[in-house]
Amino acid sequence: MAQPSNYWKQDLLPLSILILTLVATECTIGIIASGIITVVNAVSWVQKRAVSITTRILLLLSVSRIGLQSIILIEMTSSIFNFSSYNSVLYRVSRVSFVFLNYCSLWFAALLSFFHFVKIANFSYPLFFKLKWRISELMPWLLWLSVFISFSSSMFFCNHKYTVYNNISLSSNICNFTMELYVAEANVVNVAFLFSFGILPPLTMFIATATLLIFSLRRHTLHMRNGDADSRNPRVEAHKQAIKETSCFLFLYILYAAVLFLSTSNIADASLFWSSVLRISLPVYPAGHSVLLIQSNPGLKRTWKQLLSQIHLHLQSRY
């Protein structure tokens, strides 16, 4: 996790190993899920010799998440075992890459939500009808614009210098070890504001489109219920499932934005418990969202089940 605020160097490692194990598990699940999305959509692209808007967004989203979760895992490992210092070129590259891929991932997820909202929602406004008509033409430009915004925003972190020093030691009764906390001499408020400012536009887009889509689906579901005595209508059930999935996406997205803000603001650094919780929570969204995307897509879900079946058979043959 390439944070500009701090890293850990531990005298004793029990809690560190536990945190690293949990983070590695989350990142591995996320990388595998994103890899499945990438492979399935890439194969579909090659076979059809054409790429749909949804396929294009999913490809960009999954590739950005593979890179993001790889950086989170590498940075977590290096910070715990002190493989590299904060002043190294490697850390600067890692930090900028983390910010860029984070912004890209957030933008692509927001644009996917926006595209689904325009295609699925039903609102009787002339502007909305015009947007629905032109959305396929606009999306490629919006994707390129989001990449440009992400790259430009991440460059602000390229030349930001940090002077690291041994500041304090925190003692914890958990596992009986002492943790040395290294704090960067930087204007943390400015760093947190700058990073959060880049998160705000895609966060606003995602919340707005997901909320409006849920509202539209619920309204349509009530309309179908009133017109059909059969409460187990497949269309009603499909709408209910879409509402649940969108609600889960929205919850994970907001949770991730909150974790990013708290991580960059150093609010939780004085507490060993909350600092550990933030580190463990960071990979939850990219992994969880990718798994939910697979579960909501029949083709991806089938590939996911086949992979799990192969892993299960392999483990049975070994043990």
Curated annotation (Swiss-Prot):
Extracellular domain ranges by topology: 1-16, 78-97, 159-187, 269-273
Ranges in the topological domain labelled Cytoplasmic: 38-56, 119-137, 209-247, 295-319
Record keywords, A-Z: G-protein coupled receptor, Glycoprotein, Membrane, Receptor, Sensory transduction, Taste, Transducer, Transmembrane, Transmembrane helix
PROSITE patterns for this protein: G_PROTEIN_RECEP_F1_2
BP GO annotations: detection of chemical stimulus involved in sensory perception of bitter taste
SUPFAM superfamilies the UniProt entry points to: Family A G protein-coupled receptor-like
Membrane topology of this protein: Multi-pass membrane protein
GO molecular function: bitter taste receptor activity; G protein-coupled receptor activity
Pfam family membership, one: TAS2R
Function, as annotated: Putative taste receptor which may play a role in the perception of bitterness.
Protein name: Taste receptor type 2 member 39
Protein species of origin: Rattus norvegicus
